[in-house]
């Protein structure tokens, strides 16, 4: 990431800041997604779904590490990510005190969103065509993995809770 230009997305400060802001949410977000699935993992009896959960946890951990490294590069340019990430950490503390069903519903919503975003990126490679090569590699890799495990949180939710009321409510919020 150290080689990535400051305005790495279409040479645009706005688009670069937008993508960097999105990236800065991933380490805490990915950790929360893992937490929400682990909350109920012991209730899942299906071996295939357990294997998918294990893969999901591994992929989310890799995403968190990759985006932590990507985000660290922006401190060189005096991006103030620490204040934003402190705000995210306070929100994370709040949602981790919600009922596990609500936490998993939140994860379902975000995983759905990131899979849609990942699908868009892969169907429209021109969107990322103006990024530095290292940035393209990060975002395309992350997009592929989001699509690969897009249904895991949903499948866990259905397996454990079997209803849509809370999940749909959270999805609309």
PLM-predicted stretches and their roles:
Residues 1-173:
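Non-heme di-metal
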């Amino acid at each position: 990431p150290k080689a990535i230009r400051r305005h790495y997305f279409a040479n645009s400060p706005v688009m670069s800041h937008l993508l960097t802001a999105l990236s800065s949410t991933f380490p805490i977000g990915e950790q929360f997604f893992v937490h929400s699935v682990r909350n109920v993992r012991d209730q899942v009896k299906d071996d295939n779904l357990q294997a998918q959960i294990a893969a999901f946890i591994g992929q989310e951990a890799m995403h968190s590490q990759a985006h932590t490294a990507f985000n660290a590069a922006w401190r060189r340019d005096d991006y103030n990510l620490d204040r934003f990430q402190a705000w995210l950490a306070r929100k994370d503390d709040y949602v981790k005190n919600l009922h596990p069903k609500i936490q998993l519903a939140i994860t379902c919503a975000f995983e759905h969103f990131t899979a849609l975003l990942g699908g868009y990126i892969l169907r429209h490679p021109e969107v990322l065509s103006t990024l530095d090569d290292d940035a393209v590699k990060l975002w395309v890799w992350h997009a592929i993995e989001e699509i690969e495990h897009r249904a895991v949180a949903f499948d866990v939710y259905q397996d454990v809770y079997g209803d849509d009321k809370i999940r749909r409510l959270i999805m609309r919020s």
